[in-house]
């Protein structure tokens, strides 16, 4: 079992609170309990190993995908519910309780992020952390301070194994 709760050295100094580390099993439980989760996918998920696991997460838990950057093209033929949105705009929209969501059925109660550079996703999730009730779980390779919960800093092999465990627990 991969220990995703270790090595949480901060590389940024902003914010008054930091995310709690989360193991794949607990992340899967929280994702399963969410009423309206959204999988937020960045361009770093274009790595075939990550992309395969993103598709498995989406299909296993029936979670729609917010495809940001150039990730939509890679998801187009994967038979998943993926829609394009700018990542910063998504962070802004998540703070609006009246936002209809990408499907018109209302805002989300949880966002799961994967495939982003650390400095970028920390800024995007800062809005959700400080101005909404939306919970954010970062299943990134690096520890994300502004998520509600995050994996720790992992090697590539540990990250792949942690994502596999997450899929198994969903």
UniProtKB/Swiss-Prot annotation:
Biological or metabolic pathway of the protein: One-carbon metabolism; methanogenesis from acetate
GO biological process assignments: methanogenesis, from acetate
Pfam families: CO_dh
UniProt entry keywords in alphabetical sequence: Methanogenesis
Gene3D superfamilies on file: TPP-binding domain
Domain of life: Archaea
pH dependence: Optimum pH is 8-9.
Biological role stated in the UniProt entry: Part of a complex that catalyzes the reversible cleavage of acetyl-CoA, allowing growth on acetate as sole source of carbon and energy. The alpha-epsilon subcomponent functions as a carbon monoxide dehydrogenase. The precise role of the epsilon subunit is unclear; it may have a stabilizing role within the alpha(2)epsilon(2) component and/or be involved in electron transfer to FAD during a potential FAD-mediated CO oxidation.
Subunit architecture: Heterotetramer of two alpha and two epsilon subunits. The ACDS complex is made up of alpha, epsilon, beta, gamma and delta subunits with a probable stoichiometry of (alpha(2)epsilon(2))(4)-beta(8)-(gamma(1)delta(1))(8).
Similarity field: Belongs to the CdhB family.
Identification of the protein by name: Acetyl-CoA decarbonylase/synthase complex subunit epsilon 2
Native source species: Methanosarcina mazei (strain ATCC BAA-159 / DSM 3647 / Goe1 / Go1 / JCM 11833 / OCM 88)
Lineage, highest ranks first: Archaea, Methanobacteriati, Methanobacteriota, Stenosarchaea group, Methanomicrobia
């Amino acid at each position: 079992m991969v220990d995703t709760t270790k090595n949480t050295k901060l590389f940024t100094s902003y914010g008054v609170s930091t995310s709690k580390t989360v193991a794949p099993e607990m992340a899967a439980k929280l994702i399963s309990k969410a009423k309206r989760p959204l999988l937020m996918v960045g361009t770093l998920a274009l790595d075939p190993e990550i992309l395969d696991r993103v598709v498995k997460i989406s299909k296993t838990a029936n979670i729609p995908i917010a495809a940001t950057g150039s990730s939509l093209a890679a998801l187009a033929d994967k038979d998943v519910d993926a829609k394009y949105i700018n990542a910063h705009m998504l962070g802004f929209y998540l703070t609006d309780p009246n936002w209809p969501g990408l499907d018109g059925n209302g805002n989300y109660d949880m966002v799961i992020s994967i495939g982003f550079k650390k400095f970028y996703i920390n800024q995007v999730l800062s809005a959700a952390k400080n101005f909404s009730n939306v919970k954010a779980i970062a299943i990134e390779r690096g520890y994300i301070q502004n998520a509600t919960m995050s994996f720790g800093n992992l090697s590539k092999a540990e990250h792949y194994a942690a994502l596999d465990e997450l899929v198994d627990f969903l």
